């Protein structure tokens, strides 16, 4: 078959018009050094800071250090497939993480990959892990309470929604227990929780996840894990990923609580990466911007203005001190960034006073305005009573020579210290806390043996549940002690005390 000249020309024209050159331009670089979770590459001239990069082995990397003739890349995974001469290409996007309701109840790594074996996470939204914190105009002062369920904290060091409250202390003083108790106490509230484990042992993290499952707390909790065996880049990213997940709830008019356990290990991971990419070391070999590392993270916790949905993100960072040295570099940095600290003391812990909170050194700088009125009414004298007791404690051995007023102060103090003790993972509703502290500060415990105070407290809760449910409900609703509540409260305590056998 022969084609006419004109037909052949038309076919050729249409073919040329529909011809597409499917050329995809990619900017690539070449790795010239790799080791310890860090690679250096040349050729990535237009790369952005914190841009996600991809190695030819399939591993992801993050542009961490931008220099004149090379890029320092932190490897987000195994470096085993990356060698000198490997190709690394730009993706053109900043590192982001999945966010949203789909992550509730899941355990993930800092890149958003599931670790719990419950299948893929089909998140509808993604958000950059590094974000600028809300400005002054977008914020509202902290005014709603975030109840921890721990008597000593809710009474004397109250925390509000949108606050940053540091939990600081030596190893094995109960820091994680305080944070987990706070998560457990959000069970019947509208607060979503995020627990970020940074550099923790896998067995410890597994135990915490099991506890959260057992107590029904995983229904509203997301766990982000970068364990001790994970490379430093993942430990560095973990808190930022957790914060991004919490910000999704904050920005959608909801409330979230995030626990960073702990930021000491986070600073160490950052120090390791900074030294490997040859950033100049400063005090304790930390880089000069380690303050900014934590300030930009913790400033993202905020209470937003009503026009923006009135959401909040509350942060509980944990710092581990060495031999009680609160004046070390990282502890002082984080103390100055946060809105107060809860200081846990080994001496108190070893004496059996748990939670081992040193009330003198602990403070909440903004939470007072968030405390419910009923708690303010009963706990007003509590801190003062305990301070007077601590002053006179040294004279206890001379008990027989003391005047009656001093003896009464010591006796009241001993009972209050006993009353503030609390077992782990057993948060108490705030209305019951109010009644117990009212009993302590109004002399109901003064003639009860110190050894029976805990028994008195536990039996009192049972008695109230059985006989004075209306009083608990009224306290919960009114959140204040008016004359009617006060008379019911006195009646309940008098009745219970008459039937109590120490």
UniProtKB/Swiss-Prot annotation:
Chain positions recorded as ATP binding sites: 169-176
Membrane topology classification: Peripheral membrane protein
Pfam family, one: ATP-synt_ab_N
Site, Required for activity: residue positions: 362
Keywords assigned by UniProt, alphabetized: ATP synthesis, ATP-binding, Cell inner membrane, Cell membrane, CF(1), Hydrogen ion transport, Ion transport, Membrane, Nucleotide-binding, Translocase, Transport
Gene Ontology MF terms: ADP binding; ATP binding; proton-transporting ATP synthase activity, rotational mechanism
Subcellular location, record wording: Cell inner membrane
Assigned EC number: 7.1.2.2
SUPFAM superfamilies found in the cross-reference section: C-terminal domain of alpha and beta subunits of F1 ATP synthase, N-terminal domain of alpha and beta subunits of F1 ATP synthase, P-loop containing nucleoside triphosphate hydrolases
Reactions catalysed, as given in the entry: ATP + H2O + 4 H(+)(in) = ADP + phosphate + 5 H(+)(out)
GO cellular component, one term: proton-transporting ATP synthase complex
Enzyme class: translocase
Function, as annotated: Produces ATP from ADP in the presence of a proton gradient across the membrane. The alpha chain is a regulatory subunit.
PANTHER family reported for this sequence: ATP SYNTHASE SUBUNIT ALPHA, MITOCHONDRIAL (PTHR48082:SF2)
NCBIfam families: atpA, PRK13343.1
Quaternary structure (record): F-type ATPases have 2 components, CF(1) - the catalytic core - and CF(0) - the membrane proton channel. CF(1) has five subunits: alpha(3), beta(3), gamma(1), delta(1), epsilon(1). CF(0) has three main subunits: a(1), b(2) and c(9-12). The alpha and beta chains form an alternating ring which encloses part of the gamma chain. CF(1) is attached to CF(0) by a central stalk formed by the gamma and epsilon chains, while a peripheral stalk is formed by the delta and b chains.
Protein name as it appears in the record: ATP synthase subunit alpha
